[in-house]
Amino acid sequence: MPADSGDRVSRRTALAGISALFLAGCERLGFLAANAPAVFGSYKRYANIPYGPEPQQRLDVYMPERAAVEPRPVVVFWHGGRWREGDKADYRFVGAALAESGYVTVVANYRHYPQVKMPGFMQDAARAALFAAAHAHEYGGARERLYLMGHSAGAHLAALLTLDPRYLAAAGQAAPHIAGVIGLSGPYDFLPLLEPDDQDMFGPPPLYPESQPINFVRADAPPMLLVQGLNDETVKPKNSRNLAAALQALGVPVTLKLYPKVSHADTVAALTALLRGRAPTLADIRAFVGRSSE
């Protein structure tokens, strides 16, 4: 499948208005606008690769334009949307930012509620991660340097997939080595479930604890970077604080970054070129991958 390459042209026109959309709270429009500069980036993209038979089981691979001397880290990213909505096409700016940082990046779709309930989207996450590990070498990546990353609901997928080994084991392949987890504004400790659709999605009630990453912390978990905005009204900062504390109590290396005056969307929006001044998300990701890859 041929790749499309971003052109090195002026980004000024494409970037105009993105910041205003986010500041106005138009997050959906902001994410769409954030992809405008990504079109002009220095990377290769392989789009709509199937990792399963369902229409939503598709992923895009982004890789640096320049060849590497040695295999690169591989980052698998899942979008947010309360497990109900979202699409990888909205997050081209994430793939571009990470590829331009030197990582082979996989941006994966997954089935949403109500098409599936728990554990349906976890099964999709497992399949995407296994696909990324199995095919990393085809894109210049190292399967032993695999990072799982997500924003909001996607961060929940990344954390639970890493901490609860049942999902990767059930996929029928040898579980890959996970070098680290990068969670942006993730829900990790969100009981009780108050909304009827949440209760249905994660139910029945005896199964509610199965949805909580914090209930599966273990001493052999890989290093984690947990990023949270202190102005997040969608996923409270206690989620990242509590998971970090539980992991640290077991001796797991955790980097907790709490950004003042940063919202739920800001942590991921800061990966697009114009908005990188809003939060140091990309710099913290680069530092984390650099440390944990040594």
Set out the residue ranges of the language-model regions.
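N-terminal cap/lid segment of alpha/beta-hydrolase-fold proteins
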Residues: F31-A67
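Mobile cap/lid helix-loop segments that gate and shape the active-site cleft of serine hydrolases
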Residues: E54, G186-F216, P222
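Short beta-strand element of the alpha/beta-hydrolase
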Residues: P71-G80
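Catalytic nucleophile-loop/oxyanion-hole region of alpha/beta-hydrolase
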Residues: G86-V94, V106-R143, L275-R276
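Short beta-strand/loop motif that positions the catalytic acidic residue
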Residues: L226-Q228, D232
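C-terminal catalytic histidine-bearing segment of alpha/beta-hydrolase fold enzymes
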Residues: A249-E294
